[in-house]
């Protein structure tokens, strides 16, 4: 423990210092204790010329008037600018400058495009006139009545020199009358016959009356309706083969001119549906006999007369004897008509063919060696019509099966099963 010294009483304790005292006051007190001279700043007079250290308050006070001065100056400047803007400004005239190179190139390009458009338009219009001149100059007169050799060589007749054959004939139509009149009948040419058919042209040939007119035309014609065949009476099939070879060796004779039937439609009339009927044929082992009507109702077309295949051999053949038809009260009939009348009406029969010519139909049945056939007469549009039927069958299926037993030529005509009630109604 330190000893107490008398000097210690004179020394102040630093712990006894007041908290508010500054370091200068402490230093001053120490200096006074030591006896050092002190300067009293209050007694010193400072000149205004000396720079004083400004305080913060003084700085703020000095800055405020400076800011006010700057604001006043800026306001004055804005007012001056507004005054200057309000004054009308004089427009300065643009100095005339030479055209730039770019503008010159654009103008040249536009001129070139215009020239191209004009040139293309003139080129398109020019060929039309030149082509018309070429076509006019390239036209050649063709003389149809001239010689073929001259036309082949390119020789053209001199203009202005025309013969009587080349002169053009004026065609004048007759004047039209105000009142309806009958049309002029065209001039009939040689080898043709005019036939007037009633009804529409599409269904005119299906009418029995029109078929009869066509049959009459075919009968009156001088042309054969079937190819000529040669069949001697003796030697059977061997002589038939020899006749074919002879006809092949001999040249064909000239044929007479055909007769054409001109069909003109008239006013339509009520048509009656006809049943399909096979075409009648003439016997093969005969000379060319009378022409046969070859019309077929379901086809509604008239078959043209076929050409002669060869000349007939000069051999006389016996024509088949015509069978006498058993006359009945209704008209011409052949066969057992009573069996058809007495059979039940629910049964069926086979219709083989029909025609307006009784003799041809009966002769064809004889030629095909048909058995139990019946030819009976009926009327159709007021005209006689003959139907060829064969057999009596209990059902339609049985009648269809019986078709296979018929000759091949008969089967080719497509026979069909017909109810007996229709046959019995026709016989009454």
UniProtKB/Swiss-Prot annotation:
Lineage of the organism: Bacteria, Pseudomonadati, Pseudomonadota, Gammaproteobacteria, Enterobacterales
Name of the encoding gene: damX
Ranges annotated as spanning the membrane: 104-124
Single annotated GO MF: peptidoglycan binding
Residues of the signal peptide: none
Biased composition, class Low complexity, residue ranges: 288-335
Function: Non-essential cell division protein.
Broad class of the protein's primary localization: membrane
Biased composition regions of type Acidic residues, renumbered to the chain: 65-82
Coiled-coil positions: 55-87
Xref: InterPro entries: DamX, SPOR-like_dom, SPOR-like_sf, Vulval_dev_neg_regulator
Polar residues: bias regions: 236-248
Feature: compositional bias, Basic and acidic residues: 7-36, 50-64
Protein name, per record: Cell division protein DamX
One Pfam assignment: SPOR
Keyword terms of this UniProt record: Cell cycle, Cell division, Cell inner membrane, Cell membrane, Coiled coil, Membrane, Transmembrane, Transmembrane helix
Composition skew (Basic residues), residue ranges: 86-95
Family: Belongs to the DamX family.
Region (Disordered): 1-99, 149-191, 225-344
Annotated GO CC locations: cell septum; plasma membrane
Gene3D superfamilies linked: Sporulation related repeat
């Amino acid at each position: 423990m330190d000893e107490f010294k008398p000097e210690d009483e004179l020394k102040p304790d630093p712990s006894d210092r007041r908290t508010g005292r500054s370091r200068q006051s402490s230093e001053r007190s120490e200096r006074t204790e030591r006896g050092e001279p002190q300067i009293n700043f209050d007694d010193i007079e400072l000149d205004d010329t000396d720079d004083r250290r400004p305080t913060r308050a003084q700085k703020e006070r000095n800055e405020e008037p400076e800011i006010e001065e700057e604001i006043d100056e800026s306001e004055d400047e804005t007012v001056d600018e507004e005054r200057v803007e309000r004054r009308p400004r004089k427009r300065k005239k643009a100095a005339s400058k030479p055209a730039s190179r770019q503008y010159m190139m654009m103008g040249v390009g536009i001129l070139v495009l215009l020239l191209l458009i004009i040139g293309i338009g003139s080129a398109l219009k020019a060929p039309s006139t030149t082509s018309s001149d070429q076509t006019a100059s390239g036209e050649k007169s063709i003389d149809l009545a001239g010689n073929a050799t001259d036309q082949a060589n390119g020789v053209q007749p001199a203009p202005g020199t025309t013969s009587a054959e080349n002169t053009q004939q004026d065609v004048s139509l007759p004047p039209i009358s105000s009142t309806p009149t009958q049309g002029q009948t065209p001039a009939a040419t040689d080898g043709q016959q005019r036939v007037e058919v009633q009804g529409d042209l599409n269904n005119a040939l299906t009418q029995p009356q029109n078929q009869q007119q066509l049959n009459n035309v075919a009968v009156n014609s001088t042309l054969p309706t079937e190819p000529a065949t040669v069949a001697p009476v003796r030697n059977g099939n061997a002589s038939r083969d020899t006749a074919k070879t002879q006809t092949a060796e001999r040249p064909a004779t000239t044929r007479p001119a055909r007769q054409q039937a001109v069909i003109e439609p008239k006013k339509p009339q009520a048509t009656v549906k006809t049943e399909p009927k096979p075409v009648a044929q003439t016997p093969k082992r005969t000379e060319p006999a009378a022409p046969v009507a070859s019309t077929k109702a379901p086809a509604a077309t008239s078959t043209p007369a076929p050409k002669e295949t060869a000349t007939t051999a000069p051999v006389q053949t016996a024509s088949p004897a015509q069978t006498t038809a058993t006359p009945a009260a209704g008209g011409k009939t052949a066969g057992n008509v009573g069996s058809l009348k007495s059979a039940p009406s629910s049964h069926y029969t086979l219709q083989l063919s029909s025609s307006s010519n009784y003799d041809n139909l009966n002769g064809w049945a004889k030629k095909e060696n048909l058995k139990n056939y019946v030819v009976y007469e009926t009327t159709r549009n007021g005209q006689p019509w003959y139907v060829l039927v064969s057999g009596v069958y209990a059902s339609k299926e049985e009648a269809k099966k019986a078709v296979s037993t018929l000759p091949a030529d008969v089967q080719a005509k497509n026979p069909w099963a017909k109810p007996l009630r229709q046959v019995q109604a026709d016989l009454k």
